[in-house]
Amino acid sequence: MKLVTRYFLVLVFSLLVSSNAWAQWSSDPSKNLALADNNDGADQVQPKVKPLPNGGWYVSWFDADPKSPPPVGYSVYLQRLSAGGVERFKHDGIEVAHLSNSSTEDYGLDIDTSGNALLAFLDTREGANPQVTAAKMGPGGKALWGARGVQLTKGSVHSNTAPKVAGTSDGGVVVAWTSDSNTVLQKLDPNGKPLWGKGVVLSETGYYYFLADLHAADNGSVIVSWVRNHGFGSDSQLRANKLSATGKLLWGKKNVTIFDTGSLQFGHFPYFVPDGKGGAVFAWYTSSPALQCFAQHILANGSEAFPHNGSAASTNMTDVRVDPAASFRAATDEVFLVWTEEDANQTVNGIYAQKFGPKGARRWGQTGLVIVPLGTDSEILPSNVQVGDGALMFWIDMKGFGNASIQAARLQDNGKLKCAQFPVSTAMSNRGRPAADIVTATGLAAIAFEDDRIGNNGIYIQNVNRDCSLGQE
């Protein structure tokens, strides 16, 4: 009997180990690693991805699981992956917060200096008016700030939207959000205790400050950006500042003007990337005077490395361009930009790229490099990560409804293709909201995305190795 029992336990253990080994990076672009694939008719949406220094990953998303206890809404979920793509939490992730949101807004994901996941989101658990909550989740999935996290707002007086979070180099956590017409920031210590009183409020009489992005910088500081306008229909422009570990405005009370001529496209809240030196690289596109993409590098002291209002991606005045994404090579102070190029009527489009030198000069020709020529497929939502001496660029190629794929190409510093266009995700489906990042130490990149191959949206992820192969090296 003991022998039978021992054999049974060994068999069960072997099956568990084998099944766990199956959940790893896929080498087949038609079979990407599924993180949340409940085909229950409810969507799993809006993934964010963050690499860990050890090569692992955190991925977060919203899930409106109809089987969850009422009230049913878009709840916050999290998964941790090993460097090999093995899920460390249960499949479909762990629930960070059970919410009743009927729709989603932007939110924040980052890591702290101890490798914990940090999340900031709108929280419906405290009443009718959504509040801003921050959560810290340990590598084992434990809620380190308790089941309800740290609530940063309260009451029904203020309207709060689109929070972001950043883990600072001194072990702290900064959360930013839009409150009415202002952008507000609060710093928390490792235990979740507020450090900046009632928060640092960025405001200007007669103007709205809508939070755009937030990232950690040097010496415990953060860089924050926002869209500035004075109401619907007015020009939207881009501002930024850097806050010290104690909340001091390091770039001055007048802030840094990233862009102040013309207007951002309506609804465009540009992300930026830290330069690793205390500064940041910004990319955005305008709707007036024309649909055009720009980049700017703001140095650690708040000065502009590129000309004021940024360097244009292309001097081609016939076409238009939208949706830029930037990456930065710290060793050479170069910026890589990828975007969607369109004809004047916006009936055909392609994927183009540009490299800027340290002072903003276009290095890949005055009109950029053509990765995908203008054509009838919709080439949308490009992103890129810096790798080697160049960049790895992703985009969605949509031939028609239900027939979209994720494609990629890797460019060298000289603009030549290190890897010609190759497929990353090819199952017949619609795809959206891709989020890409890279483990700098290993050069392994990953892109997470929404995908409706199961009938409703699920969350999938695919790695890309330095040699542009998929799966285990």
Language-model region placement:
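Extracellular, repeat-based ectodomains that mediate carbohydrate processing or recognition
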Residues: 24-473
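Positively charged n-region of N-terminal signal peptides that target proteins for export
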Residues: 1-6
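Bacterial N-terminal signal peptides
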Residues: 7-19
